[in-house]
A protein has these predicted regions:
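Hydrophobic, well-structured mid-protein blocks that either form specific transmembrane helices
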Residues: 113-155
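Bacterial Sec-dependent N-terminal signal peptides
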Residues: 1-24
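Alpha-helical structural elements
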Residues: 9-12, 30, 146-148
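Acidic, serine/threonine-rich low-complexity disordered tracts
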Residues: 22-119, 158-262
Length: 262
């Protein structure tokens, strides 16, 4: 499996953990979020999240389509072009994925994959023209998440009920492999942004030992402390440099939710 640093960062940003607190109805139709990914003042990439306005249906299961797109910008798009697209069709009643699609274009590398989740049977059917064999079945738990559904499990919970030091974890299926991610609640802080000062919940993400991140507290994620509970800001201390991800725009059904300061 080939997973770029950018792909891993997007994975971490939008799939963090499953929580145990009061649940919320958060799978909103017509939602659009845009993020800026930058090294200091240099824009490196952007990421967009879009949810369909209307429900669809797969195998007679009602679903809402969610799409995440990440792409490089400027000089990064010249020397290391990347366009990654993830799509998830989620059951609104359970927030479990019914079908997930991935399309990676990273330099000369290409990867397409489709995963059909059968939670009642404990099976994920994975199909990719780049895999050998092309089709395979993978045994999964009946609550296995994909990249995008994990993001909504996070937003579904009342994060303000959490205590500092509380730890959580989850397993997700991405690119044919299961990842486990841990999260530690670090505190409640005010974050300065283009939208003014925002109350946020700060967390730290912990991964198994790897050669990408500088230290155990290298990934810091701030989640908005409001009814929307969206990833508001992220800072990553890589061995190759310091990277930031900031919210640029947030709309629901075309209506601006956070207004930028003049």
């Amino acid at each position: 499996m080939k997973t770029s640093n950018f792909t891993l960062l997007i994975l971490l940003f939008f799939q963090v953990f499953r929580l145990t607190a009061q649940e919320k109805d958060i799978l909103i139709g017509g939602e659009q979020l845009k993020y800026r990914i930058h090294l200091g003042f240099i824009n490196a990439a952007e990421a967009n999240i879009r949810s369909s306005s209307n429900l669809g249906s797969i195998r007679q299961i009602p679903t809402r389509k969610i799409e995440i797109e990440g792409k490089t910008l400027g000089i990064f798009n010249v020397f290391s072009p990347l366009l990654d697209v993830w799509v998830s069709h989620i059951d609104p009643s359970t927030l479990l994925p019914v079908k997930a699609e991935m399309n990676k274009r990273e330099g000369r590398y290409r990867k397409q994959e489709v995963v059909d989740f059968y939670h009642d049977k404990g099976i994920a059917q994975i199909s990719s023209p780049q895999n050998s064999p092309k089709d395979k079945n993978l045994a999964i738990s009946n609550s296995m998440l994909d990249l995008i559904s994990g993001y909504y499990f996070l937003r579904k919970k009342n994060l303000q009920d959490l205590e500092i030091g509380q730890k959580m974890s989850a397993k997700i299926l991405v690119d044919g492999q299961v990842y486990e991610i841990w999260c530690v609640v670090k505190g409640f802080e005010k974050v300065e942004s283009k939208f003014g000062t925002k109350n946020c919940i700060r967390t730290s993400l912990v991964l198994p030992k790897n050669n990408l991140f500088q230290d155990k507290d290298a990934i810091r994620l701030w989640i908005s402390q409001d009814n929307y509970q969206i990833p508001f800001k992220m800072e990553v201390n890589l061995k190759i440099g310091f990277l930031s991800i900031d919210l640029e725009d947030y709309k629901i059904a075309g209506k601006t939710i956070y207004t930028a300061l003049p």
